[in-house]
């Protein structure tokens, strides 16, 4: 937060400090050279988890202040309007789309482009993007590869959950699936009679194994694996991490089964306090030369979203490791995958990330949002006027830092639906 003071109509809002975006947050985790010992139900001394449990309680106490506002449509709407007003990147998507000839510019697009620009991956020319529709990650990678890396081509495969009901629409808002069916690994429910039918649900062990097989059959090597899955938890944000455990395990396992040696991985997560999540991070630390917990600047600071990044995969699964992990997904329980007492140095680094991202940044912005709600409930236009000059400065800075260039028409992805202007 920066010390800017505002005056309006003779009144002073000296507490109203523009929410200056933090820098890209990146916390490195140590590589684990000792052997990986997976367990079906590992036990962990409670003392190891105490500070993570305290962190969860502290964050949930702040989130709980918003719970009553979610119960009434009018107050819920006002709250989201206020949170939108203090989002320093609101409006950036449309600018990027029209200034740089970009496609499918969603929030996911901004985050992926920022990750690619910041993390300095060795190769992103062949990618498997999971939990992907409507396609923001693929589009950002395509834009980055052609404007920054100048690869002669970008090869990709992707998957997303295909709705089980014919009445539910596939989230193919831009026609990326419709126009590129050969790039997609999941199948319509109309093909259920097929022996190898796969609807893209990564909480099903057989689907995970099959998706990895399909990906490697169609694309080898795979230099980059991404997964942006998340279950809509409604208003129950206090259980967001817990409710997504199985999904996040499945999307991670799909990546570890398909990513080539030397490849890179980007996985969406939320808070990092549950013993199972911590154990999954410990597993990652055996496979990548570099491992990070990140929070892109363009990821809204009021949410718990984090991205785990692995660089330069060092080895593949052993048959035993693959068997144990697939079995755990099939018969899922949320006990740790490993003995966490063997990873205390790594857990210290994870906790530093929790402190930095959630206990400091997120709580600060949530408190700021609630104060704005109380003071600007019926003055949202005024709040927007105060913040507009700073938003422009921050957005212009983001565009410069992330080295955006115009995408040539010949490199654009094939989309069947007209590209609609981003809602921002």
Swiss-Prot record:
One of its GO terms (biological process) is 7-methylguanosine mRNA capping. InterPro entries: Adrift-typ_MeTrfase (IPR025807), mRNA_Cap_2O-Ribose_MeTrfase (IPR050851), RNA_MeTrfase_FtsJ_dom (IPR002877), SAM-dependent_MTases_sf (IPR029063). The keyword Methyltransferase applies. Induction: Expressed in the early phase of the viral replicative cycle. GO terms for molecular function: mRNA (nucleoside-2'-O-)-methyltransferase activity. One of its GO terms (cellular component) is virion component. It is an enzyme of class 2 (transferase). Its EC number is 2.1.1.-. S-adenosyl-L-methionine binds at residues 135, 228. Signal peptide: none annotated. Disulfide bonds: none annotated. Residues 103-315 form the Adrift-type SAM-dependent 2'-O-MTase domain. Keywords: Early protein, Methyltransferase, S-adenosyl-L-methionine, Transferase, Virion. It is found in: Virion. PANTHER family: CAP-SPECIFIC MRNA (NUCLEOSIDE-2'-O-)-METHYLTRANSFERASE 1-RELATED. This is Probable methyltransferase EP424R. It comes from African swine fever virus (isolate Tick/Malawi/Lil 20-1/1983) (ASFV).
């Amino acid at each position: 937060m920066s010390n800017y003071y505002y005056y309006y109509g003779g009144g002073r809002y000296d507490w109203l400090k523009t929410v200056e975006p933090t820098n890209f947050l990146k916390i490195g985790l140590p590589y684990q050279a000792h052997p990986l010992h997976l367990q079906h139900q590992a036990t962990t001394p409670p003392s190891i988890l105490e500070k993570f449990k305290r962190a969860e309680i502290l964050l949930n106490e702040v989130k709980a202040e918003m719970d009553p506002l979610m119960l009434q449509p009018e107050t819920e709407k006002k709250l989201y309007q206020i949170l939108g007003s203090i989002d320093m990147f609101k409006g950036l998507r449309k600018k990027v789309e029209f200034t740089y000839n970009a496609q499918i510019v969603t929030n996911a697009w901004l985050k992926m482009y920022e990750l690619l620009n910041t993390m300095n991956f060795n190769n992103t020319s062949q990618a498997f993007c999971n939990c992907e529709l409507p396609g923001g990650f693929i589009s950002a990678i395509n834009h980055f590869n052609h404007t920054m890396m100048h690869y002669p081509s970008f090869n990709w495969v992707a998957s997303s959950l295909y709705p089980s009901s014919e009445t539910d629409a596939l989230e193919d808002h831009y026609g990326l699936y419709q126009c590129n069916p050969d790039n997609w690994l999941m199948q319509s429910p109309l093909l259920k009679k097929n022996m190898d039918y796969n609807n893209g649900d990564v909480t099903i062990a057989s689907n995970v194994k099959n998706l990895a097989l399909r990906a490697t059959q169609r694309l080898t090597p795979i230099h980059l694996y991404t997964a942006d899955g998340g279950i809509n938890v409604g208003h129950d944000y206090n259980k967001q991490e817990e409710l997504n455990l199985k999904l996040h395990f499945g999307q991670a396992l799909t990546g570890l089964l398909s990513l080539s040696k030397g490849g890179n991985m980007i996985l969406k997560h939320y808070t990092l306090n549950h013993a199972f999540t911590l154990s999954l991070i410990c597993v990652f630390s055996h496979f990548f030369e570099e491992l990070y917990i990140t929070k892109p600047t363009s990821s809204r600071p009021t949410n718990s979203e984090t991205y785990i990044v692995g660089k330069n995969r060092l080895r593949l699964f052993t048959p035993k490791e693959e068997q144990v992990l697939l079995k755990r997904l099939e018969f899922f329980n949320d006990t740790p995958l490993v003995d966490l007492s063997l990873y205390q140095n790594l857990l210290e680094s994870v906790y530093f990330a929790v402190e930095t991202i959630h206990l400091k940044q997120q709580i600060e912005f949530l408190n700021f949002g609630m104060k704005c709600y109380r003071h600007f409930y019926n003055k949202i236009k005024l709040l927007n006027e105060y913040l507009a000059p700073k938003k422009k400065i921050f957005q212009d800075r983001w565009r410069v830092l992330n080295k955006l260039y115009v995408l040539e028409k010949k490199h654009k992805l094939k989309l069947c639906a007209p590209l609609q202007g981003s809602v921002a």
